[in-house]
Design a protein with these regions (language model features):
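Positively charged n-region of N-terminal signal peptides that target proteins for export
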Residues: 1-4, 20
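Sec-dependent N-terminal signal peptides
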Residues: 4-13
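Short glycine/proline- and aromatic-enriched beta-strand/turn motifs that initiate or cap beta-hairpins
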Residues: 20-117, 288, 292-298
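Transmembrane beta-barrel architecture of outer-membrane proteins
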Residues: 55, 96-100, 151-155, 204-208, ...
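Residues on the lipid-exposed face of transmembrane beta-strands in outer-membrane beta-barrel proteins
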Residues: 60-62, 101-105, 156-160, 174-178, ...
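Extracellular/periplasm-exposed beta-strand and loop segments of Gram-negative cell-envelope proteins
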Residues: 68-96, 119-152, 179-202, 232-235, ...
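Repeated loop/turn-to-beta-strand initiation elements of outer-membrane beta-barrel proteins
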Residues: 110-113, 166-168, 219-223, 255-258, ...
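Transmembrane beta-strand segments that form the barrel wall of outer-membrane beta-barrel proteins
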Residues: 222-239
Length: 304
């Protein structure tokens, strides 16, 4: 009886030991399989993001900026006029609607080149509440004037990602905003002889430096943020620029997405000419919405 009991104990101990070995091996294999499946799933998920990591990206949409514009233009005799607030003094609407477009080329894993275009045309008519000096003329109190401001901004920017991962990238920017501006005032008289006008136009190349970040938030969601600043005098143009942008992307279908965000730009330009000097300060900020299409091959992004 005791021998039988000892044989049973030895049998159960051996069975338990073998079961533990098998269980540990099975658990180890299961963990490896889960890890491999997780990696494969993550890679498959990233590969399924048709909007992310493409060579080319083009977008176009509308911008709803709130403007704040100040202009001061001197006369041909070298004397400056007075500072004019275009919204307050000339009746320009602060809130406007404009067109914006952008194109991006991902040259390599870390390098990208982009262009942007922004256009805004504004007009106003108002009876003056105070005397205004602009260019060679004085516009008296109670006179009706019409005014205009045309702005076009082109931007060329190069970005380099010093951190480049499949789901997020962070890098530096170097580029330039080139602004083509034309502003003017016209006195509306009863006769053609009573009318007179002045305008001031200039081109301002404004270089900038900045930082940017791009993040994959989910299968259909992405986030982009950038900020830029620079101040420099180039020939007869002394300029300062501060810009920023925050936008969220939602992938609607395959390579087509919608982006919504908030953008701001503040520019100050002093222009010196032989017979005419001008000061121009313009700031705007507001929401944007655009359609974005990504195409071309996919840039390889590494986890390490």
């Amino acid at each position: 009886m005791k021998k039988l009991l000892y044989l049973l104990i030895v049998f159960f101990l051996g069975f338990a030991s073998q079961a533990q070995i098998v269980a540990e091996a099975t658990l180890k294999d299961s963990l490896v399989n889960v890890k491999d499946e997780s990696i494969n799933y993550q890679n498959q998920t990233l590969d399924d993001l048709s909007w992310h990591g493409r060579r080319f990206k083009v977008s176009a949409g509308v911008f709803f900026p709130t403007n704040n514009t100040e202009v001061e233009v001197g006369s041909n005799n070298g004397e400056f006029g007075n500072l004019i607030d275009f919204e307050k003094d000339l009746g320009f609407n602060k809130n406007t609607v404009s067109f914006a477009a952008a194109f991006e080329w991902r040259i390599s894993r870390r390098s990208r080149l982009g262009t942007e275009y922004f256009y805004l045309k504004r007009t106003a008519s108002k009876v003056l509440q105070r005397e205004i000096e602009f260019g060679d003329h004085v516009y008296p109190v109670d006179a009706r004037v019409s005014a205009f401001m045309d702005n076009q901004i082109y931007r060329l920017v190069y970005g380099y990602a010093f951190i480049s991962k499949p789901t997020y990238e962070i890098g530096a920017l170097i580029g330039a905003h080139v602004m083509f501006a034309d502003v003017g005032i016209r006195l509306e008289g009863n006769t053609a002889q009573a009318e007179y006008r002045d305008n001031f136009d200039f081109t301002a190349p404004l270089p900038d430096l900045g930082l940017w970040g791009e993040f994959v938030l989910a299968d259909k969601w992405g986030l982009y943020v950038n900020a830029n600043y620079f101040a420099l005098k180039v020939d007869n143009v002394d300029g300062r620029l501060l810009s920023y942008n925050l936008s969220v992307l939602y992938n609607v279908y395959k390579n087509f997405s919608i982006t919504a965000g908030y953008t701001g730009l503040n520019i100050r330009v002093d222009v010196e000419r032989e017979r005419l000097n001008g000061f121009f300060k313009w700031g705007y900020n507001g929401p944007t919405i655009a359609a974005t299409y990504a195409f071309g091959g996919r840039v390889k992004l590494y986890k390490h």
